[in-house]
From Swiss-Prot:
N-methylthreonine modification, residue list: T399, T400
The name this protein goes by in its record: Methyltransferase/ribosomally synthesized type I borosin cyclic peptide precursor ceuMA2
EC number(s) recorded for this UniProt protein: 2.1.1.-
Keyword hit for Transcription regulation: no
Biological process, per Gene Ontology: methylation
Residues annotated with N-methylhistidine modification: H406
Alphabetical keyword list: Methylation, Methyltransferase, S-adenosyl-L-methionine, Transferase
Start and end residues of each stretch annotated as Clasp domain: 247-370
GO terms of molecular function: methyltransferase activity
Lineage: Eukaryota, Fungi, Dikarya, Basidiomycota, Agaricomycotina
PTM comment text: CeuMA2 automethylates at Thr-399, Thr-400, Ile-401, Val-402, Val-403, Ile-404, Val-405 and His-406 before being processed by a prolyloligopeptidase which likely forms a peptidyl ester upon removal of the follower propeptide, which then undergoes macrocyclization with the N-terminus of the modified core peptide. Peptide backbone alpha-N-methylations change the physicochemical properties of amide bonds to provide structural constraints and other favorable characteristics including biological membrane permeability to peptides.
Modified residues (N-methylisoleucine): I401, I404
Organism this protein belongs to: Cerrena unicolor
Length: 407
């Protein structure tokens, strides 16, 4: 539905680590919003939000209550934000972690706002899962990863795959539909884990550090340990459970042949091992023959002839940074690029022309050049810049990253 009304809704994530995970993008919206709602867990972030905002702030946690169904709370959280949107305000709501991961009122509010003709969007934040990838040290792509919510896992009797990483969220609120977290049903989750992994398989109880004074929790237990009363007490609403792979999935030789991977897929396996070399207790060799050969070439490396470096005036550097961080400027630019650009001093004619398209291709084209072209004073022609308007590619680096991820 086309947006026709003046109010807007932006949902953002504060990340996990207090203040440190708030992105520059979120900060820019915080400084420009008319009304700010938040549902976060630590007072430092709350103080930061209040100090950096210009609009009225409201704590959504006030709608939680031990005697209320959480579903009722989530509807109320959504509705109070929507009321201000309907009144024509630009509303920002900041939620702990990633605002779209295991969060109900955010998706509800965005869906309703859009259905009523308002502009609504979500800005990402660091989730517990992102934090876990860094702290525990594993790549979800190798050999794959499944993410489940604890209660949903049990209700739908989902089978966990022992050949991939398994992440189970909200293990400290199994079967809870209010705000009473007593771990009474935790044993049902342990039953399920024993069925799929056995009692001696090791798992990690994970809680990412929130406050500057906090310490990250990465406690390792066997699944049978999870039945011990003193262990169960350690699981809270911020707990996540990581279950490492128990076995290696068999290779499908028919597909290997179709992909033209030789033998047992050595080329793919080498890449997979390189991705997973930092995983805990992986046992992988960081400097095998292939890795060492790559290292040996470093001292003799020369950039290819088509390698491009940054070539940008101070004006385009400032403007593109402001465009990324200032929502109001971005809105005005998208409505009428030329009128905004006319007010920016210092842009070269090529830079202004490239920016006038409001397309990424011309900007990439004009802000990079080979060292040889720079030394010779060569500039891209206007036709070359215009010809890149249909390109979304940021160049070889991003293309290479995509190929590596999907190989």
């Amino acid at each position: 539905m086309a947006t026709t009304k003046t109010g807007s809704l932006t949902i953002a994530g504060s990340g996990i680590a207090s203040v440190a995970h708030i992105t520059l993008e979120v900060l820019s919206y915080l400084q420009e919003a008319d009304k700010i709602y938040y549902a976060i867990v630590d007072p430092v972030t709350e103080a930061f939000i209040q100090d950096k905002s210009k609009g009225r702030c409201f704590d959504l946690r006030v709608y939680y209550d031990k005697d209320k169904m959480r579903s009722e709370t989530y509807v109320q959280m959504s509705e109070v934000m929507l009321r201000d949107v309907r009144s024509g305000y630009n509303v920002l709501a900041i939620f702990y972690g990633h605002p779209g991961v295991f969060v109900c009122p955010t998706h509800r509010a965005i869906s309703i706002a859009r259905s009523e003709g308002y502009t609504a969007k979500m800005l990402p934040g660091v989730s517990a899962e992102d934090y876990m990838f860094s702290d525990i040290g594993f790549d979800p792509a190798v050999p794959g990863c499944m993410t489940q919510e604890a209660t949903s896992l049990l209700i739908y009797n989902k089978q966990l795959d022992p050949s991939v990483h398994n992440i189970i969220w909200q293990v400290g609120s199994v079967g809870v539909d209010n705000m009473v977290f007593d771990n009474k049903q935790f044993h049902l989750l342990v039953d399920h884990l024993e069925r799929d992994f056995g009692s001696i398989h090791k798992v990690i109880h994970y809680v990412g550090a929130i406050m500057p004074q906090s310490a990250t929790v990465m406690d390792e237990y066997t699944i049978s340990d999870l039945r011990k009363e003193d262990v169960v007490k350690k699981f809270t609403t911020t707990s996540t459970l990581y279950i490492p792979p128990r076995e290696i999935a068999p290779v499908d030789q028919r597909i290997m042949q179709a992909l033209e991977f030789s033998g047992n897929g050595d080329r793919y396996m080498a890449l997979s091992q390189l991705r997973g070399v930092h995983a805990r207790n992986s046992g992988l060799c960081a400097y095998g023959p292939a890795e060492q050969a790559a290292v040996d070439k470093l001292d003799h490396h020369t950039p290819p002839d088509d390698y491009e470096v940054l070539r940008a005036s101070p004006a385009i550097r400032r403007f593109t940074e402001d465009l990324a961080l200032k929502p109001d400027l971005r809105s005005r630019y998208k409505e009428d690029p030329l009128s905004v650009l006319d007010a920016i001093p210092g842009l070269t004619s090529q830079e202004k022309f490239a920016l006038s398209f409001d397309k990424p291709g011309p900007v990439y084209k004009v802000m990079r050049a080979t060292p040889a072209a720079i030394a010779a004073g060569q500039e891209h022609s206007l036709d070359e810049i215009a010809g890149s308007a249909d390109s979304e590619s940021p160049g070889a680096l991003a293309t290479t990253i995509v190929v590596i991820v999907h190989i």
